[in-house]
Amino acid sequence: MKEIITWLFIWLGTNTYFNTNHPHPTVLLMPQEEMNRLYYQDNDHEPDSLHGLYDKSNDTIILPDDWNKEDPFEMSVLLHELVHYLQDVNGMKFKCTREMEKDAWPIQQSFLKQVYNYDWNYDKLWYLMISSCSDPFNF
């Protein structure tokens, strides 16, 4: 994992404004059910809905225990969580946690295109909803 994170830090340092001169975060592989409990505080959600988490209280990235470094999308999930780690350790300020997604999704998309020639066309409306501090269901 150390070599993978080093490579991703090099890519992020070259392609973003992030300072990547930081220690590597801890990366844990965890069963999906445990990830759901940790994030949602229950286990009543789609079984595969969480692809990764970043716990800023202890600089830890959590990935499903079946994470596969050979899969371009799964590699991009690790990159996405590394973006959150770098936002944290670089002291970036956000109005809310969701606002951290404004950088992570486009960077993940760019990584997939540049490295794997993979077109990830995520739903832009969904992106606006999950990266905004306002409640999209309460006008």
Predicted regions, residues:
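Auxiliary, metal-adjacent structural segments of Zn-dependent hydrolase domains
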Residues: 1-61, 114, 124
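Stable alpha-helical elements in mature extracytoplasmic
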Residues: 4, 8, 74, 78, ...
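Short, solvent-exposed loop/turn segments at secondary-structure junctions
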Residues: 32-35, 68-69, 83-84
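Short pre-active-site segment immediately N-terminal to the catalytic Zn-binding motif
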Residues: 61-78
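Substrate-binding clefts and substrate-entry loops adjacent to catalytic sites
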Residues: 64, 86-94, 114
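Active-site recognition of the HExxH zinc-binding catalytic motif
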Residues: 76-89
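Post-HExxH zinc-binding segment in Zn-dependent metallohydrolases
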Residues: 97-132
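Disulfide-rich extracellular modules and peptides
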Residues: 135-136
